[in-house]
C-alpha cells in the first residue's frame, strides 16, 4: 500500500528535492549573470549582501543594546533585572527569526557568488597540508541542493565521493555574512586543518576570516580562531572549550562566542555513535589506591578458572545427552536445554558451547528452558545460576557473583561475609535500640558500620570489574596492549583511541588483567553530553553518507530532518545478497577462496572485518596461500595512507577493520573499471546497518563500477546473540551440510531483524541517557548561567543584597520561632561578621519581619562602610571571587554526589521503583541543597573577605585556571548502569592532552602518522597573571608578549 501511494505522490525525499529545484534554477540564473563581473565587482556583491542583512536586523540589535545598558544600573532590584533579562531573551528570539528571514532572501545570490568564485579558482595552485593542491571544483546542481538543505538546519545524506566538503562551503559562506560565526565540526584535527586550508581560498576571496581549533592550541590562540567568521574543529574541542569557559576565572579567559550555527560532518558518527559518551573534564582523586585491583586479581583468576572447568564439565555432559538416541524424551530435552543455558550464562564465548548450539534442535531446547525460567520477572533464574560461580548476561554486559562464587573467593581464615554488604538499615536500628551503649559509643559504632559498608562495596565493585575484564573484554577485539598500555579500539572505526579510558574502574581492571601499570582514578569537575552540547546552537545541520536508517532518532532527539540528496551520476555498484555459513571456519575458507578468485581476475578487493583478531586470522590464512595483501587495523594504523592509496590498484588485496569504512576515498587504478571496479567483501555484519552501508560505500563512487557482498556465519556475535535460532531451524529443514552456503531471503531478513533489534536497543540506551542527562542539563544551565553573569558583570552588589534579603528572612523566621535571640546574634556574627545588637525587648517587639529588616539594614550599612573603606575596584573583585569560587567548589561537590547517586540508582528497581523517577527526585533534592549552600557561602565570603584574604583568593582563582590547563583531564565517558539496561558501546574516558594523538590522525591522506604520547604541560603563567620574572607587569605585557 505504501509503495502504491509513493508511486502516485512520490516519496518524502522526492517531495523534499522537488521543492528545492526552483531555488537551484534561481541560483544558476544569478551565476550566469555574475560571470561578466570583475573580481572587485564580485566582492562588492558580497558586501551588498552583508549590508542587506545588517539593514534587516539593525533595529532589533539596537533594542538589545539599549536593554543591556539598563542592566548596568546598580540601583536595579533583582526583580527589575530579571524582567529586563526576560525582555532581552524575547528580543533575541525575534532577532534570530529576522536573521533567518534575511538569509533566505539572499540565499540564491550568495550561493551563486560561491559557485562563480569556485569557477574562477579552477586551475589555481595553493598549499594544503604541505602539498600543492590544484583547485578543480565547481558545485553541481545536486551539491547546491545539499547546501540549501544544510542552511535549512537539516541533515544532508550524500553518497561517497559527492563532495560534502565543498557542499558545506555554500551555507557556511551564507551564514558567515551575519558576522556571528559558523562552526564546522569534523571527526579529527587532521580533517579540521585540511578542510580549512582546502576551502580557505573561496572565503578569503571575499574577505571572510577562517580559523581552526586544534588540540594543542593555547587558550589565547583558541580565542583568535573562534573570533573568525568561520571556525573548523572537532566535536570534542568545541565541547571541552565550552566546559573550560564555564570554569574560567576571568572574562578574558573565555574563548568561545555565542553558539550560532554549526555544520557537523559525519553527523551520524558524532550525534549517534558518540552520543553515549559524555564529555567530562576531571581532576585527580587524592589518595586513590590503584593497587586494590592487583591485590584481588589472584582470587578472581582462580574463580574464572574454576568457572571455565565447571562449564567444560557441563558441556561434556550435555554433548553426551545430545548424542544419545532418547532426544524425544521431554526430560532429556529439558536437561539438554538447561545444560546449554548454564553454559551460556557461565561462559557465552566458549567454543564448544557455540558449536553445540548449532546442533539440530539444541537452540530450541535452550530457548524453551530459558523462557520457562524467565517467567514472572525471571523469578526462578537463580535456580540456573546457583550452580555457577558467577553469571554473565552478555547482551546487557553485566556479571553477577553468586553465593557459590562468594564462598569460593573467601579464604578459610577470613570472615565468611568478606564479600557481603552489611544491611545498614537493620544494623543502625540495632545500635539505636541497644540500651547498653552510650551516645558516644553509638556514634562510634555507626561510623565503623559506614566504614565497613564502604570497604566491602568497593571490594565487591572491584571484583565485578575484574570479572568483566576477564569474561567480557577480549584482547585484540575491544582493546589492544601496546608499549605497556591498554588502548581501546573504537568499535565503529577500528581505530585506536589514544588517551581514552574505560570508566568506573574498568580500565584499571583491564590493566591489572594484562599486568601493565595501573593508572590513577579521576573525579568529575564538569560534564555535558554531546546531545545537550549541540542543542546549544541556534541552528544545527549535518551531512553524512548514512543517516536515513536513523532518521527517526535524529528527529526525535535533535529535531533534525534527513533529506537524501540524489547523486550527480547514478550508482552502478552491485550489492549482492548475504552468503550465510554455519561456522566461522566455513566462512573464512570461503572468503579466502573468493579473494584468490578475484586476485586471479585482477580485480582489487577490500575485505572488511570487525576486529583486529579477525583481520590477523585472515592475514595468516592468506600467507599460507602465498597471496600478497595489506592489513589495515588498529595495530598498523601508521601505514593507513599508503594502504588506502593502493587499495584500488590491480590485484590489490586489502584487509581492513572498520577504519577503512569512513572518511576514506579509494580511487580506482588504471584498467580497474574494465574488470568490475572495487570488490567489497564484508566478513561479518555490524550491529548497525549504517556501518555496513559505510563499508559498501567505499565502492561505486562517482558512477564507478563495483560490487559488495557480506559473508556471515551463525557463530558471528550479531547472529549468536540476536538472530540465530530461527535461522538454524531453517538450515536444518533445508538439510544443510558442512561447507554449504545459503542465500535465502528469510535468512537475510533475519539478519536485518537482528540489526534492527540492536539498533532499537542502542537507541533506547541513548534516549535513556538523554533522560538522565536532561536532569543534569537543567541544573547545569542554571549554574552556568549564574556563573557566566557573575563573570561578565563588573559589580555584583545587586545579587549580594538579594541573597542578603533571603538570608535575613530565613534566619529571622527560624530564630524568632525558637525565641533564640543569642543564637541569632551568634550565627549572623559568625557567618557575616555583622553584630546586630538586639536587646531582649527589641527581639520580642520587632517580630519576625522587624528582625529580618534589622538584619538586612545592619548588614547593608556594614557592607557600604566596607565599600567606602576598600573602594569599588577591590569590592568588585571580592564579589566576583566570592561568587565564582563558591559556585565552582560547590558544583564539583555536587557532581561527585550525582556520580554517587547514579552508581546505585538502578538497585531501586528491585524495590519496584522506577530508577529514573527516583533519580530525578533525589537529584532535585541535592540541587536545592546546592543552591542553598551556594547562596549562604557566597554571602559569607562577600562580607568576611578583606584585602589580605582577597589578595590570597585573587591568586587562588588564576591558579585554578592554570591547574585546569595542566592537571585536569578531558574525558569522553559512557553512561554506566544508571543510564542503560543494555551494553554500552564503549565506556570510555578521554585524556585531553593524550587525545590530541587521536585527533591528529588523518583518515587516509598523510604519508606517516606521527606517533604521539600523552603530553604533560609544564606550568605556564596565564596571559593576565603576574609575570614570573618579578617585574610586577602582567605576563602578556612582559615575557609573554611574544608567546
From Swiss-Prot:
Its EC number is 7.4.2.8. May bind 1 zinc ion per subunit. Pfam families: P-loop_SecA, SEC-C, SecA_DEAD, SecA_PP_bind, SecA_SW. Its main location: membrane. Residues 980-1005 have a biased composition (Low complexity). It catalyses: ATP + H2O + cellular proteinSide 1 = ADP + phosphate + cellular proteinSide 2. Coiled coil: none annotated. Zn(2+) binds at residues 1027, 1029, 1038-1039. One of its GO terms (molecular function) is metal ion binding. InterPro entries: Helicase_ATP-bd (IPR014001), Helicase_C-like (IPR001650), P-loop_NTPase (IPR027417), SEC_C_motif (IPR004027), SecA (IPR000185), SecA_CS (IPR020937), SecA_DEAD (IPR011115), SecA_motor_DEAD (IPR014018). Residues 1033-1043 have a biased composition (Basic residues). Keywords: ATP-binding, Cell inner membrane, Cell membrane, Cytoplasm, Membrane, Metal-binding, Nucleotide-binding, Protein transport, Translocase, Translocation, Transport, Zinc. It is a peripheral membrane protein. Residues 980-1043 are annotated as: Disordered. ATP binds at residues 143, 161-165, 665. Disulfide bonds: none annotated. The keyword Secreted does not apply. GO terms for cellular component: cell envelope Sec protein transport complex; cytosol; plasma membrane. Part of the Sec protein translocase complex. Interacts with the SecYEG preprotein conducting channel. Has a central role in coupling the hydrolysis of ATP to the transfer of proteins into and across the cell membrane, serving as an ATP-driven molecular motor driving the stepwise translocation of polypeptide chains across the membrane. Monomer and homodimer. Part of the essential Sec protein translocation apparatus which comprises SecA, SecYEG and auxiliary proteins SecDF. Other proteins may also be involved. This is Protein translocase subunit SecA.
